[in-house]
Amino acid sequence: MYRAAASLASKARQAGNSLATRQVGSRLAWSRNYAAKDIKFGVEARALMLRGVEELADAVKVTMGPKGRNVVIEQSFGAPKVTKDGVTVAKSIEFKDRVKNVGASLVKQVANATNDTAGDGTTCATVLTKAIFTEGCKSVAAGMNAMDLRRGISMAVDAVVTNLKGMARMISTSEEIAQVGTISANGEREIGELIAKAMEKVGKEGVITIADGNTLYNELEVVEGMKLDRGYISPYFITNSKTQKCELEDPLILIHDKKVTNMHAVVKVLEMALKKQKPLLIVAEDVESEALGTLIINKLRAGIKVCAVKAPGFGENRKANLQDLAILTGGEVITEELGMNLENFEPHMLGTCKKVTVSKDDTVILDGAGDKKSIEERAEQIRSAIENSTSDYDKEKLQERLAKLSGGVAVLKIGGASEAEVGEKKDRVTDALNATKAAVEEGIVPGGGVALLYASKELDKLQTANFDQKIGVQIIQNALKTPVHTIASNAGVEGAVVVGKLLEQENTDLGYDAAKGEYVDMVKTGIIDPLKVIRTALVDAASVSSLMTTTESIIVEIPKEEAPAPAMGGGMGGMDY
């Protein structure tokens, strides 16, 4: 009996040990799924973050102004990239130190936000972010209240934006548009004039795209086309990973006014596209469930170039937009109102065009195959509807449709002697085009950073609730001097001297022409900046840098140490020669 009890106890211990081993093993397996974290606090955290901000900003700021330098960026494949575009430089920088990288990533966020909103001004935003955060760190280290500093910064930015809006003037002439484009293209007059011509051809609200040219020279080509303000439904449809766009050459275009959910509804049109060896674009109210899955699987596994886009607009406006698209591409709208559906449509109901480019936000259809006479008749119907309409909203929508149907698309073809040169010029043309659109939208202010410099003088009058908020205002006041300082320094002149001389006089149009090395009337000379670009750069920079100033701890992953590779085994015996 004793032996039986001992045997049972032994088995229980073994079972317990086995269970404990399994529990420890499961805990180890669970912990392996989570990386260890490192936490930095207070001054140390902000100092490390500041180092990342400063190093990134120093790399970006060398591109600023007419005498700014190029930056050469190593790429994982192909030749190095040469650029003067601030956001391109910022995006390329990664630090080994995780905390430094947090600071750099937040500056990249500023540059990206400014680029997305205004299309230009990324270098200015980066320089301002560094200036505000540097002063903010010093103030917090000296014992200032971080939240009061942030309130002061916010008050100062609001006051400066109001001042800039009062300083702005609208532009309208082709010459003024060319001046804005020239400044944003780093003084290349040819690019400014090319953009002005493109806007003249398709209107200020028209669609202008940028493409690689086939010659040494820049060219302007106007192609009849239409832009839809809807992008691809799924990123799986992307065909160009570099531009994050789906590009389809000579596609079949299916236009449907209802949702597409059934797999069988898209199989027929996919087979048709495969048979004709052509890409496929589907424009419908929506594509979801089985239908969307079928399209994605055929794109990924069968290699069929396909893309689905939601139809633009709502209700009757959507139907009208689809009808416009059908006439432009020579197809028909497959609608149940006329007894048609996706199971019984005929091949002649599909439209086509020369090229379709789909981004996450919009779709550009170039050179539709529709009958010219039908397109002109449709445009005339819209013009008549505009004349007869009494609603401002309806008129606006009708004018949008008319512009899309008959305005066309201007293509700026950028030429050069090498791929690197074309890439660098395309970066500058993109900045110039975005800046020009921003200038037309909100107006212009004197360029070269002087608008911000003169706005800083107005902050002397700003009333604050306490001393710490006053310091926040002074941080912005000092930061607003950095764009002029940086542009002058890049031109080989003492920046502090230029800033001091400009602040001494009262003419708010006077500035420093870094290209010629003289003080001039910036507006008369054509050195101007779009208000939207300057405003967005300041607001984004102040927002992120003031948040960084209030940071008290940073949590980052501790990099895993890779185990060394095992040594190679010995050779087989008898293999010596």
From Swiss-Prot:
<dbReference type="InterPro" id="IPR002423">
    <property type="entry name" value="Cpn60/GroEL/TCP-1"/>
</dbReference>
<dbReference type="GO" id="GO:0005759">
    <property type="term" value="C:mitochondrial matrix"/>
</dbReference>
<dbReference type="InterPro" id="IPR001844">
    <property type="entry name" value="Cpn60/GroEL"/>
</dbReference>
<keyword id="KW-0496">Mitochondrion</keyword>
<protein>
    <recommendedName>
        <fullName>Chaperonin CPN60-1, mitochondrial</fullName>
    </recommendedName>
</protein>
<feature type="transit peptide" description="Mitochondrion">
    <location>
        <begin position="1"/>
        <end position="34"/>
    </location>
</feature>
<comment type="similarity">
    <text>Belongs to the chaperonin (HSP60) family.</text>
</comment>
<keyword id="KW-0809">Transit peptide</keyword>
<keyword id="KW-0346">Stress response</keyword>
<dbReference type="GO" id="GO:0051117">
    <property type="term" value="F:ATPase binding"/>
</dbReference>
<dbReference type="GO" id="GO:0140662">
    <property type="term" value="F:ATP-dependent protein folding chaperone"/>
</dbReference>
<dbReference type="InterPro" id="IPR027410">
    <property type="entry name" value="TCP-1-like_intermed_sf"/>
</dbReference>
<keyword id="KW-0143">Chaperone</keyword>
<dbReference type="Pfam" id="PF00118">
    <property type="entry name" value="Cpn60_TCP1"/>
</dbReference>
<dbReference type="GO" id="GO:0005524">
    <property type="term" value="F:ATP binding"/>
</dbReference>
<dbReference type="InterPro" id="IPR027409">
    <property type="entry name" value="GroEL-like_apical_dom_sf"/>
</dbReference>
<dbReference type="GO" id="GO:0006457">
    <property type="term" value="P:protein folding"/>
</dbReference>
<dbReference type="InterPro" id="IPR027413">
    <property type="entry name" value="GROEL-like_equatorial_sf"/>
</dbReference>
<keyword id="KW-0547">Nucleotide-binding</keyword>
<dbReference type="InterPro" id="IPR018370">
    <property type="entry name" value="Chaperonin_Cpn60_CS"/>
</dbReference>
<dbReference type="GO" id="GO:0042026">
    <property type="term" value="P:protein refolding"/>
</dbReference>
<comment type="function">
    <text>Implicated in mitochondrial protein import and macromolecular assembly. May facilitate the correct folding of imported proteins. May also prevent misfolding and promote the refolding and proper assembly of unfolded polypeptides generated under stress conditions in the mitochondrial matrix.</text>
</comment>
<dbReference type="GO" id="GO:0005739">
    <property type="term" value="C:mitochondrion"/>
</dbReference>
<keyword id="KW-0067">ATP-binding</keyword>
